[in-house]
Each structure stands twice: as structure tokens, then as C-alpha cells.
Design a protein with these regions (language model features):
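A structural micro-motif at secondary-structure boundaries
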Residues: 4, 13-35, 105, 113
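Flexible coil/turn residues that form the inter-helical turn or adjacent wing/linker of helix-turn-helix
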Residues: 47, 62, 421
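Extracytosolic ligand-binding ectodomains
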Residues: 118-524
């Protein structure tokens, strides 16, 4: 059957050569990738097509989420007038794949529609990569960013794409492993031929992808708040720089809460080490004191010791830079030790609405988080964004800062692509500076000098229901400064290089390698 140019399952005719689907004499519009999914199912009519087989055929072996595939099947059912519960065309075989039910007739029985009814063939699609952790420790945190990124792509495609060309996402799993991120970035550029990569969360994953986009003259759009100390012409940063999150939070804790004694909790990553170095500089410059600085590993028994140390030192406030699932065990032990927000509050730098879904209200209500965006923001643009997201993914879903930053990154890139040749990665990089967008959290703009984004900073108090009450906001968007002013760029680069060397050339490391450092802050 694969050699046929025309496939018929009344009242539909599928013209493979011209990538057209007809219902009687009426053309049925399908996106290019949706057509490819249908074509493969039709070519293999009346037999089970596994998900893996379908993904390998249509996406050439690239890693694509099941949710994305289900979205294309839903589109097909809508176009065919099919019912998932009582299918006439596409049957879902739970956990296995799909079966195209109708018998497909020989092409000899087909009368091709008049040529005058055939529109011009649509221009080819624009492929973009989405590279986040869909498995491993970071999956629960990163997967929602994929959803927000896909939502932005869908919005742009609904408006005609980029110069009439549909954006086709290629979603790949970084597996919570910096080496996997590097391998997958190469695959996206060399094999999938994407014209941009949206992704990475941890600084370790970004640092692993950085030399790849540099060497291949490519483009990464990075959506996460981070420690700064970096400026790469091949990366555009839509998350917060330190002066847009960490430093204002310190100033607020010292100036508004009047706290003097601080405890720092992080994990064995470049982000936590660098963030805590920034905090130490700022706190000591203000006359405050760091009474403890500890780092934990995922699932580490060291968490119990860290909590015991916090109880013994009795700080005024804890700054927490743990990420992903690491906060679950730590927070429960903290509360079990009697350390509550009323006694010793915590300011989180990586806990947002997504993470709050995994923590019970009694464990976290009253603590604080520093971000640029909260779902609770009362802005028309935000209400519309939340409504669209929930309409697409379910009313139970929440949105968070990095999801909004991922969403912004797609729209900023699309504006730059519209303004130049969308296939020319270097031209898009030149067009991105000074692009601005009215996002859910306010107007943002890419700085022309450092490729970071002007953003409004906000502090939120955790309230019942897993949301935040905004208690402080900067008066206007803050210009990004990737290198904190407490040290020179050279000194910060030396700080990072010392960590990288101590960790055996990696950006995260096991506890045994951490012990090579003299103490919790000797890399300074």
C-alpha cells in the first residue's frame, strides 16, 4: 500500500503526492505533521500501529512526548468527524498505539478532484527543538515548561505561522542528565535540522549545551532563572538574572523583614553554589551573617543532618535553592523538626506553583518565593494566558514562572524570525535584541548588550490552595545584569572554573567530589 499516491476511505480521499485530504469535493485543511500521521495510519490500515512505530516514521526517531502525539490524533479525529469513544476511523489501543479502522480502496476507484480545486502546496515547516527533562528528578518541574512552549507554538501557528510556514516542534528528553542534554542538542541540530532550541532548566544542562550551540553557530533560548556569570552570544535568556531575583530578595529580607542571620540550603550544582556565593557577598555587605551553608544530594540521608544543623543554629531566615523533587523530603523533615514559617521563614528561589502541588499546604503556607511571575497576577494578559493554558491542558493545571518564560521565549523568537529569514539562525540572533512582548507578567524586552531580558521582580507569600499572594513588586522592569557587582566578571569566572575543576570537569558532582572543597564556600 505504501506505493499508492491516492487512498480512499469514503467519503474521504487522501492524495499523498499533493499532501491533500478531500471529503467528497471539499478540501479538508490539515497541518503538515497532522497529514503525515494520517498518511502513515492509512498506509497501515486495519493493523495496530504502535506509538513507537508512528513516532519513528513521522518524527524520524526524535524523542516526542505522548501528549504531543495525542494532540495530533485529536486533530485528526476533529477533521474526520470521529468519536474517540465510538471510533469509525481511528481506534486507540490503550498503552499500545492506534488502528485505522476503515478498509482503504484501490486507487483505481478514485477520481482525482479537478486540478483547479487544488491550492498551491504549502511552504515547508520550520522545525524547532524543545529540550527538557521528561524523565528523572527534574521531570516534574520541566515537563510543564514543554507544555507552555507548545502552547505558544500553537498560538503562532493558528495565526499563520512564520511567514506562512508552520512551526513544527521536535520534543526531546534531557533525562535530568547534563550529558544527555549535550547529546540531544547535537541530535536536534545535526539530525532534526531545527532552527532554534528552546530548553534546559538546570545550569548544568545549559553549560553542557553552550559549547554545542557555539561550535555549530546555533541558538538556545533558555527560560530559567539562574546564577548569572555568563554571557553567550548564542544563548538568549528569558529567565531572571541574579539582580532580577536573588539580590532583590536579599534586600527585601534585610530591609523589610529586618533579618540578620541567614542559613543557605542548596544542592551540589553550579546554580546553588553560585547563588549562595552571591547571597554571602550581599548579606555580609549589609552587615548580616551567614550562620550555615549546606548542600544535599537527591535522596541523600544528609538531609536529616542538615535539618538538625538548622535547628541548632536558629537562623532568622533560610534561603533555599533546591530544585525539583529534592524539596519534598527536605521540607517534610524541616516541619517534623518543628521549624515552621512562623519560627524560621524560608525564601525559595526554585519553588513555584508546580512544586507546591506536591507539598501539603500545612508544610509551606507562610513561606516566600522570589520570581518574576505568579499565576495569581491580576492582569488581563495573565487571565487570558491561564485560561488558554487550562483550556488546552486541563482545568486542574497551574502555571508558573519558568513556564511563562518559556512561553515568552517562543513569541520573542517568532517576532525576530518574522523580521528576517527564519532559516538563517545567525540572522535571527541579530534580530532578537530589543524585541519586546507584552506577556502575562508584563512587558519584557531583550537587552541589546547582554541577550538577557528586562523583567519585573516579585515576591510572593505562599497561601492556601498552592498559590502565591504577591507582597512586593519592583516599580518597573529591571535591566538584567548577569554579573553581580560584588565581584569582577573575571573573579566570578574564576569562581566557576574552580568549581568545575573540583567536580572533575562536570557542573554537578557527587558528595565525594564536593569534599575536595575545603568547606561550603571555599570556592569563593
Amino acid at each position: 500500500m505504501a506505493s499508492r499516491a491516492i487512498f480512499v476511505f469514503p467519503p474521504f480521499r487522501l492524495d499523498a503526492a499533493n499532501e491533500q485530504l478531500w471529503r467528497d469535493s471539499n478540501r479538508v485543511d490539515l497541518r503538515p505533521k497532522t497529514f503525515e500521521v494520517l498518511l502513515y495510519l492509512v498506509q497501515n490500515a486495519q493493523r495496530l500501529v504502535t506509538k513507537r512505530e508512528l513516532l519513528d516514521s513521522v518524527w524520524a526517531g526524535a524523542s516526542v512526548s505522548d501528549e504531543l502525539l495525542r494532540g495530533y490524533v485529536r486533530e485528526l479525529r476533529d477533521a474526520l468527524g470521529d468519536d474517540a469513544k465510538k471510533p469509525r476511523y481511528i481506534e486507540t489501543v490503550p498503552t499500545r498505539g492506534y488502528r485505522f479502522l476503515p478498509r482503504v480502496n484501490d486507487e483505481s476507484s478514485v477520481q482525482t478532484p479537478p486540478s483547479e480545486l487544488k491550492p498551491a502546496k504549502a511552504p515547508r515547516e520550520l522545525r524547532v527543538g524543545i529540550l527538557h527533562s521528561l524523565t528523572g528528578t527534574m521531570a516534574s518541574t520541566e515537563s510543564p515548561v514543554v507544555d507552555a512552549t507548545l502552547l505558544a507554538i500553537e498560538e503562532i501557528n493558528e495565526r499563520g505561522g512564520i511567514l506562512g510556514r508552520e512551526i513544527q516542534p521536535v520534543v526531546i528528553d534531557g533525562a535530568s542528565d547534563e550529558r544527555a542534554f549535550a547529546r540531544q542538542a547535537i541530535a536536534l541540530i545535526a539530525e532534526a535540522k531545527v532552527c532554534a532550541i528552546f530548553g534546559c532548566w538546570t545550569s548544568a544542562s545549559r553549560k553542557s549545551v553552550l559549547p554545542i550551540v557555539e561550535q555549530r553557530d546555533h541558538l538556545l533560548i533558555y527560560p530559567t532563572q539562574y546564577e548569572g556569570m555568563e554571557q553567550c552570544s548564542h544563548i538568549f535568556y528569558t529567565g531572571a538574572a541574579p539582580n532580577q531575583q536573588i539580590i532583590p530578595a536579599i534586600n527585601w529580607a534585610v530591609g523589610f523583614l529586618r533579618k540578620k542571620r541567614f542559613f543557605l540550603v542548596g544542592w551540589n550544582s553550579i546554580y546553588s553554589r553560585a547563588a549562595n556565593a552571591i547571597i554571602r557577598d550581599e548579606v555580609e555587605a549589609s552587615g548580616g551573617e551567614i550562620v550555615g551553608e549546606e548542600y544535599v544530594l537527591p535522596d541523600s540521608t544528609e538531609v536529616t543532618r542538615v535539618v538538625r544543623t538548622i535547628a541548632q543554629t536558629e537562623p532568622d531566615l533560610i534561603f533555599n535553592s533546591l530544585v525539583g523533587d529534592m524539596n519534598l523530603f527536605y521540607t517534610r523533615l524541616l516541619r517534623a523538626a518543628g521549624i515552621t514559617p512562623e519560627k524560621i521563614p524560608t525564601v525559595y528561589f526554585s519553588v513555584g506553583e508546580i512544586e507546591l502541588q506536591s507539598l501539603s499546604a500545612r508544610e509551606i503556607v507562610g513561606d516566600y518565593a522570589a520570581w518574576n511571575y505568579f499565576q495569581s497576577l491580576d492582569r488581563p494578559e495573565n487571565h487570558a494566558f491561564v485560561k488558554r493554558f487550562r483550556s488546552r491542558y486541563g482545568r486542574h493545571r497551574v502555571v508558573a514562572d519558568t513556564m511563562e518564560a518559556g512561553y515568552l521565549g517562543v513569541h520573542l523568537w517568532a517576532q525576530a524570525a518574522h523580521a528576517t529569514d527564519p532559516d538563517d539562525v545567525a540572522a535571527i540572533r541579530r534580530a532578537l535584541p530589543n524585541q519586546s512582548f507584552e506577556g502575562p507578567g508584563g512587558r519584557v524586552r531583550i537587552d541589546a548588550e547582554n541577550q538577557h531580558t528586562w523583567k519585573t521582580m516579585r515576591l510572593g507569600r505562599i497561601v492556601e490552595g498552592g498559590q502565591f499572594e504577591v507582597i512586593w513588586s519592583s516599580e518597573k522592569p529591571i535591566r538584567p545584569e548577569p554579573y553581580p557587582s560584588s565581584r569582577s566578571p573575571t573573579a566570578w569566572n574564576e569562581f566557576l572554573n574552580k568549581l568545575h575543576t573540583a567536580w572533575g570537569g562536570n557542573w554537578t558532582k557527587s558528595q565525594s567530589a564536593i569534599s575536595q572543597l575545603d568547606d561550603g564556600h571555599s570556592a569563593e
